[in-house]
Amino acid sequence: AVDGISYTFPMGEKITVGVGNDYAGSSLYSTACVYGGPTKGLDDCGNAMSAMDASEATGLSASFDIGNGFAAAVGYEGEGDTASGLMTKEGTDTYGAQLSYSADQYAASLTYANYDTSTTDTTYWGLNGYWTPAETGTAVPSISVGYEVGNPDNTSVDTSHYLSLIHISEPTRLQDI
């Protein structure tokens, strides 16, 4: 069974655009995390909400290579499978942006998302980073950290955080960011 259809394409040398049904608006984000796990709870690296990924949403994303290790991305997800429609007051719409920096052994990213429903607007911010040793297979682990804060307009502040120490003996196991 087909669970989603998407299309990603370049627009020049520095811009990539993606669009699709059942497509995460954060698909072209460069979240700074070296861990990739089998469960969403572990591999979201502490930014489960700011790195928006609604199921069954129509999505659009774009990434921009700024240069010198910097990248920016924007994304949108909308409730397109119901009568509520895209970008309506009744529908659920999420939009976000990310600024990231990556170097050979470390990276950082700042992610923003706004979830807009018919009753609540919730803003999330996520900050992530990682460092990997120059040589893998040593006793020194890779380190990934993440912190997220959410502020629903009708409740108190919501936070999540993440720390992982990963010891990898084969460099081919590292997630390409």
What do the predicted segments below correspond to?
Residues 13-15, 58, 66-70, 95, ...:
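Outer-envelope beta-barrel architecture signal
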Residues 128-132:
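Asparagine-biased alpha-helical interface segments
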Residues 1-79, 100-102:
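Outer membrane beta-barrel
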Residues 21-25, 76-80, 103-105, 112-116, ...:
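Transmembrane beta-strands of outer-membrane beta-barrel pores
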Residues 70-111:
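Loop-centered beta-sheet repeat module
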Residues 3-5, 56-60, 93-97, 123-127, ...:
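Hydrophobic, lipid-facing positions within transmembrane beta-strands of outer-membrane proteins
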Residues 166-177:
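Single conserved hydrophobic/aromatic residue that forms the stacking wall/gate
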